[in-house]
Amino acid sequence: MKRFSEERGGGWEQHDLPNGGRASGAGSVELWVQRVVGVGILLGSLLTASGVTAPPPKEPVSEPRIGGLPLFADWPKDRRPAVTVVISGQTYGFLQPCGCTRPQLGGLERRAQFVQSLKAKGWPVVGVDLGDIYPQQMYVRQQGLLRYETIMHALQAMGYLAVGVGKTDIEAELDKLLTAYALQEERPPYLLAANLLGQVDGKVISRQERFQPAGLNRPLIDRFEVAKVGEVSVGIVGLIGRSLAEEIENNKLEPSITFVKNAQGKIDNGAVLQEVLLGLEQHPLRPQLLILLYQGSAEEAALLARDFPQFQVIVCRSEESEPPQFPTRSKNGSTLIVQVGHKGRYVGVVGAFPQRGGSWQLHYQLVPLTEYYLAPGSDAEALRNNPVLPLLQTYAERVRDRNLLEAVSKRPHPVQIQHPDLNLTYYGSHRCQNCHAADYLLWAKSAHSHALDTLEQKARRPNLRHFDPECVICHSVGLEYQSGFVSASKTPALKHVGCESCHGPGSGHATNPQHAGLQLLMSPWKQEAADRLPSLETMKKLASLPLVEQRQAEQALPISQRRTVERVASMCMKCHDHDNDPYFNLYVYWPKIAHGMKP
């Protein structure tokens, strides 16, 4: 993950990390760790999510830089862009950074603040989004719809003109999404997918028939949109790529839609674009700048750029969550192919500067949405001045009022599946203290023991996150599992991150502590009963090393210890993942909560 100058302190408390292991002799390894020097090869293990062992030092929050340069460093200084296009996509329902650690990137509050900063320069600004607004997965489907609706209203507040239609949007049952926003709002941002048609019982029907409810003047999903931005007429076209369209049809992700095809029954996006370009030529505003929102790969986008050089900008899907710093130029040099990554951590900005003869000089800037773009002032001031924050607060209130926390579907925990005869249930950490008194006291002093309180007391912009299943799942015990957390009032013993968050439902072990099979079940990271983490002393020494040396040193650990470290880290990263804790490192975190082992 890229590192930018950004303040680290404050925010929520850093959550520690639970686990259970036992001591192992590794004296030779410990001596080797003391002696290790030099540079090694980075290994692709799961020990850190970001490639660094600790957050950057605390510094004043400054404007982000890319490649060591300030934003827009190579843009003309003597004139403003005739139009500025802010580009986002593949947001996947991401509203705000969770705040569990800092710094983090992205969020609608920061994006809105950034857009305001461009407008404050006097630049004409318009926003476009590739699509995939709906989350990739949600514990409660209704909450996914709320996120979609909230993001669409946020884009409207920021001045977006158009949004493409992506795979997650189609998987979410398209009509429910249309009902949540497009049916209610006959104004930008408009949904665009030029090759989309309807289908009833295998019979193809027109776009107008499939997506034109009575009373509205345009299809809920249209082919293109044209608007005046400043003095420039901008045309936006949406298109679902051939590969994705075939996947949608082959997997029957949405049986009520199909795509424009040729006489041989093949998806024919070329014919679609030819027809669309003709329609744009005949449009009263005669667009001067054309942008294609293309739900396909960069390779497919390059072919379209070759065949349709009329588009100055093509926005395509990002396979990786981190976007490339620079766009790709088509072979003829007339088209920028842009990718902006996932979850709104970054936006792309295209500035169009007119040249003689009617052509454009295009400049591009990738912008990381760092804490620099947090709305300034108190929370109350930010709520008044940032157009998105009231929407986020309303969203949080709706999640609470609809009691979505208790709507989470419960599934069997893996150990409940393996041993249905034992009727294993969650007990609560307080039940562990009789036999594990020292470990319980250590847990009680850790941040894990009040994780849900932290969510309630410190989460803000919006608050009320202790009612949000997507947050509570990592601040409670067993929310998604049978007999797990339901709510603070109904299951108070399962509040916070407790012993069973990692060890699994403990009723069987508590009632029969000598049962060897149950003991092994309580340590799911063990491949073999004898597997152990390195000694605490070794873990601390590894934590003190720079990352490259740390990676080199861990190769001297016994294979069973390396395997255990990796399996434990992968369990921790279910919550301490790249989004929520980009500086997670097991060697650094484990000593904070080391238990079940000798020093």
Model-assigned labels for residue ranges:
Residues 36-46:
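Bacterial N-terminal signal peptides
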Residues 79-81, 347-431:
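A short C-terminal boundary segment appended to hydrolase-like catalytic domains
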Residues 50-52:
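N-terminal Sec signal peptide cleavage junction
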Residues 7-14, 22, 26:
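Intrinsically disordered, glycine-rich low-complexity segments
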Residues 20, 25-37:
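Bacterial N-terminal signal peptides that target proteins for export
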Residues 389-566, 584-599:
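Sequence context of c-type cytochrome heme-c attachment sites
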Residues 54-371:
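Acidic, metal/ion-coordinating pockets
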